[in-house]
Amino acid sequence: MNIMIEIPEFIIPLIPWIRGVVGLVLVGAIFLGAMGAVWLERKLSADIQFRYGPSRVGKFGLLQLVADAIKLFTKEDMRPRNADRLLFDNAPIFMMSSVFLMLVAIPVGAVFINGVEYPLAVTEMDISVLYIEAMSAITIFGIFMIAYGSNNKYSLLGAFRNFARMVGYEVPLGITVVSVAIMTGSLNIVEIASAQGLLWNIFLQPIGFIVFFIALMADMGRLPFDQNESEEELVAGWITEYTGMRFGLGFFAEYIHMILGSFLVALLFLGGWNVPAFVANNPVLGLIAPTGFFLLKTVLVLMTIIGMRWAVPRFRIDQVVDLSWKRLLPLSLLNLVWAVGLGLYLGA
């Protein structure tokens, strides 16, 4: 449901600027959210393993993040002797930038102002789904720049594994997104989220949701798909040679990518910010509940992704390739046929 807010006409021209400010605030909030995701993963992992986890520095160990950040950013910034200086120094910045570029098209809610819908995002694009997919795929170039610039065999092997995995899983991921877009008749992620109402796409396309979630896990490189940085084989994979602040940039880029992936699951399959009518029509809850409900879904998806780390063992690289081409690709095509048929039926 949508929220209606009546405001003076003279404020209407300022709305793009207001939305831009909101978008910048969201960028900062996502960075803090990445720090929170690190703490959440450590605490949730500790609970699963019957440990305490961070508990000494601050209440519930919350200040452990600050302590780790101070330690990380004050470490010596070392560069291998034979590394490519240009690539080695700038690749983490490129990778972080490509992740943040995804954020500008991802909304966290929407309001109706004088009959016009304005999403809470930096910008709204008619092809925002394709834009997000493209920015997500660009991160592989940052990883290759890091690996090649490091002049390290373990880094390069990790990058090759990452490339092999992304090539296989971007295909079913993209087909599933197209299936969702067909149901809505739009590539605008705002329209896809709004069109679901309370009948979420997870109920209309359950197979598509499963394929999308598995492919997204592989795209993010989370267990059981972290063959590109498996400690037993490749030390730390593509980021082996990095220390200090540059290591921190690559590390946080992974967690920000994980948060944005959780956003996409909530937007494409879990109804986004849609709430029941009695909540949307409440003058107080109507302003808070949609975004709060959306963020709650995002946190639940994030906790599921984190929990998978301790629930499923790491796959071999051949198992990863087989799962993509022999399982997920046929299922994604089957879901595409289902989406087309269901779209024609509902349209009729």
Swiss-Prot record:
Enumerate the UniProt keywords alphabetically. Cell membrane, Electron transport, Membrane, Methanogenesis, Methanol utilization, Oxidoreductase, Transmembrane, Transmembrane helix, Transport
Q: Give a Gene Ontology cellular component term annotated to this protein.
A: plasma membrane
InterPro entries per record: F420H2_dehydrogenase_H (IPR053455), NADH_UbQ_OxRdtase_su1/FPO (IPR001694), NADH_UbQ_OxRdtase_su1_CS (IPR018086)
| Catalytic function, reaction form | methanophenazine + reduced coenzyme F420-(gamma-L-Glu)(n) = dihydromethanophenazine + oxidized coenzyme F420-(gamma-L-Glu)(n) + H(+)
Enzyme kind, highest EC tier: oxidoreductase
Supply one GO molecular-function term.
Answer: Methanosarcina-phenazine hydrogenase activity
The UniProt entry, under HAMAP family, shows:
NDH1_NuoH
Family under the similarity heading: Belongs to the complex I subunit 1 family.
Quaternary structure annotation from Swiss-Prot or TrEMBL = The FPO complex is composed of at least 13 different subunits. FpoA, FpoH, FpoJ, FpoK, FpoL, FpoM and FpoN proteins constitute the membrane sector of the complex.
Query: Would you tell me the protein name for this molecule?
Result: F(420)H(2) dehydrogenase subunit H
* Annotated organism of origin: Methanosarcina acetivorans (strain ATCC 35395 / DSM 2834 / JCM 12185 / C2A)
Q: What is the lineage of its organism?
A: Archaea, Methanobacteriati, Methanobacteriota, Stenosarchaea group, Methanomicrobia
